[in-house]
């Protein structure tokens, strides 16, 4: 009988067109009996998922929520964690390993406690640093930080129970290792599958670009509270005033849409918000552009993002303000320029004004993908490392 591996991911899914990390993990362990547990609610679309009829996937029903920062969302995550623990306790056949994506913290805590009691190998995969990553959003939420000490305790306890720590960046792994210093660990970036991205772009019905007289610039992903849209809008306003021929696309949807639309209309910018769309259309929209902006609020804890991954895979010139590993990649491979909240306007203008030179940098993404972001290679390496540590 094959070894059994259970993957737990509150947000992820498998067998979809999206580049979900859990799907890549699922494929990497193809030599084993694999099962996944996830929520039936889609965090991105704020709708319930179409449930697939697969014996390998178990969906846990959770309450819906519409705002990313809300009591309803916290309640939904708590319900998932409790139902997950009950599901684990009811398993007839136990897995040899449980691989749990973080966030959410309580989910990993219950998985860890179950694994310790049943002597099952426990792996945490840190995709975001909760609750710390939620507090830089505004002063109001930072004031709540002392009130969520139990949340921090649960997160750290989950780290300490892990037999192996995986993370989407070296920094995330190092944070967890402060609570579990002797645990084996590694980090694996989100990864890019060029062939799959090209297939999805070709499957889209979004029209091809026909106008090359303008520089097309984009921001892809959620219009949420974690991102620095003020700097983006000010930069677009500046290049507009300087006579740059451009079009700007917010290929996205989210809570900040109203404020962004108001600014665009007030200053009569050549910009638009596309709204939410299927992933293949999202990629096609991005692929038509020249420059992509990866802009988070200055106090963010994020090190590496899905949107950056998509930008690189589509060979866009990247303007980035994430520090650490993402900034290092931008510099090392010359795939774009780094900026901060004070100089985006200047840098965007410089890039647009000298676009005939800078557009050649787009091809540098290929080397970055080959050396650090090739999905097939990096996830296979991760799986082999974990299996060798556990002798599975």
Sequence positions of predicted segments:
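Conserved donor-binding/catalytic core segment of Leloir-type glycosyltransferases
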Residues: 6, 208-227, 232-237, 249, ...
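Acceptor-binding helix/loop patch of EC 2.4 sugar-transfer enzymes
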Residues: 65-72, 118-153, 195
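N-terminal subdomain of nucleotide-sugar transferases
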Residues: 1-61, 236-241
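Membrane-proximal helix-turn-helix segments that form the acceptor-binding/catalytic region
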Residues: 89, 106-109, 113-117, 132, ...
